A protein has these predicted regions:
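NAD(P)-dependent Rossmann-like dehydrogenase/reductase catalytic/cofactor-binding core
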Residues: 10-35, 39, 47, 53-145
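Short, charged, surface-exposed secondary-structure boundary motifs
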Residues: 1-3, 18
Length: 145
């Protein structure tokens, strides 16, 4: 899947059609979207990840249980904490910080203490061997903390 971003008044229909066709030749499913923060996928995914972190911070579930619930209950391949560790906690934090700067009054982008702490400690996820979960190596799965 790839997001084909259309900038209103700038991107021609011919350009969009060319990119859509090229994506199809690559075996990708292309979706059109306008130029907004996060486009479609990250605009939906990142607030979901933040809410999972807040849910855990409020004591409503362990990281492990929240991950299992979303994998089994929503048929997601990765739970939110696994996904954050896969993306890189520094990358997730950078997205949050950028979106908060763009939309400072939006509560979806309020800081998450646990994320801020882990990033400040250098625990960035799989790439450093620790994030929300600990990893024996970059290729192995997570272990319950």
């Amino acid at each position: 899947m790839c997001e084909v971003v259309e900038v209103q008044g700038v991107t021609s229909e011919e350009t969009i059609e060319t990119i859509m066709e090229f994506s199809k030749r690559l075996g990708k499913v292309a979706v059109r979207c306008d130029d907004n923060v996060g486009y479609v996928v990250d605009r939906l995914r990142i607030p979901y990840l933040f809410e999972a972190m807040r849910l855990h911070e409020r004591g409503h579930g362990s990281m492990f249980d929240i991950d299992v619930a979303m994998k089994l209950g929503a048929n997601y391949k990765l739970g939110p904490f696994e996904l954050c560790d896969h993306i890189g906690l520094d990358n997730v934090k950078n997205m949050m910080d950028g979106w908060r700067k763009a939309e400072p009054d939006n509560p979806l982008y309020a800081p998450v203490a646990t994320l801020d702490r882990l990033v400040s400690e250098g625990k960035l996820g799989k790439k450093t061997g620790a994030g929300f979960f600990k990893y024996k190596s970059k290729r192995e799965g997570w272990s319950k903390r």
